Amino acid sequence: MNFLQVAQEVIDGKIISNEEALAILNSKDDELLQLMDGAFAIRRHYYGKKVKLNMIMNAKSGYCPEDCGYCSQSSKSTAPIEKYPFITKEEILAGAKRAFDNKIGTYCIVASGRGPTRKDVNVVSEAVVEIKEKYGLKVCACLGLLKEEQAQQLKEAGVDRYNHNLNTSERHHSFITTSHTYEDRVNTVEIVKKHGISPCSGAIIGMKETKEDVVNIARALHQLDADSIPVNFLNAIDGTKLEGTKDLNPRYCLKVLALFRYINPTKEIRISGGREINLGCLQPLGLYAANSIFVGDYLTTAGQEANSDYRMLEDLGFEIELTQKQEAAFC
């Protein structure tokens, strides 16, 4: 398979077939650089060499009634994590200031649970109004399953993006969780879109899914028209259903990132949780397919130090995408 030729066809508007998608995942390691070259051709065409930086604020940790097999915050998990209720508006604002000062363009307010309470949405909404005024950051909320009126309130407050991952294929979903359905997740993304909030939805790779499942989730996100697609790689935490699962290697992770770029050529592809332990020394290559990363810690696991990420981007010759207020402050 000539990956560079397929990449050009994708740029010209082609949608790759399932056979071509599986050929990417099944490609030989000797073909990896050609595959990434093709992925970079697509990425460069739509995004140049800019990289979007994102930071997570874990606004509520633990106490989740859901049974997601990958999650240390699940009701079924025995992982020894820090647990706390929804944080204050002032704490959210303090995190936004850290994001601004560290050249993070998108600030992600994330909370555990099936869905937010009225109070949760009020706190986030009040914080977002001030964040937009003081720092001009793009704000992404990730609060669980969302109702129509909650989506409308978040939109009016200024929330730019809402994250609700599909996580895996429809076929594999019941293996990961039984406390909510695949359709529940799709419906939340559709509600977000209906109310004019940019949809963010992605996947977790390495949860005992097949390669066909990986292709199906990448294609489902294309059909859902998610603007931003976080690609997580399982960090199997002790105490969760998937503890001890080690199905990934760095080369396969790169093939997955390339696949998501070939199937979703115009979208923001973000290398997300688990990149440090699963991509290892090959992390920099991931940005030849992806154009976005998380900086700092994740929800209950540590990330790479921010200075290491900035150095990686500088070594690659990539440029951090700043907000208008950051450009005024730092340029």
UniProtKB/Swiss-Prot annotation:
Alphabetical UniProt keywords: 2Fe-2S, 4Fe-4S, Biotin biosynthesis, Iron, Iron-sulfur, Metal-binding, S-adenosyl-L-methionine, Transferase
Species, as recorded: Lysinibacillus sphaericus (strain C3-41)
Alphabetized InterPro entries for the sequence: Aldolase_TIM, BATS_dom, Biotin_synth/BioAB, Biotin_synthase, Elp3/MiaA/NifB-like_rSAM, rSAM
Name of the protein described by the UniProt record: Biotin synthase
EC nos: 2.8.1.6
A biological process term (GO) from this entry: biotin biosynthetic process
Cofactor binding: number and manner: Binds 1 [4Fe-4S] cluster. The cluster is coordinated with 3 cysteines and an exchangeable S-adenosyl-L-methionine.
Known role: Catalyzes the conversion of dethiobiotin (DTB) to biotin by the insertion of a sulfur atom into dethiobiotin via a radical-based mechanism.
Matches recorded under SMART domains: BATS (SM00876), Elp3 (SM00729)
GO MF terms held by the record: 2 iron, 2 sulfur cluster binding; 4 iron, 4 sulfur cluster binding; biotin synthase activity; iron ion binding
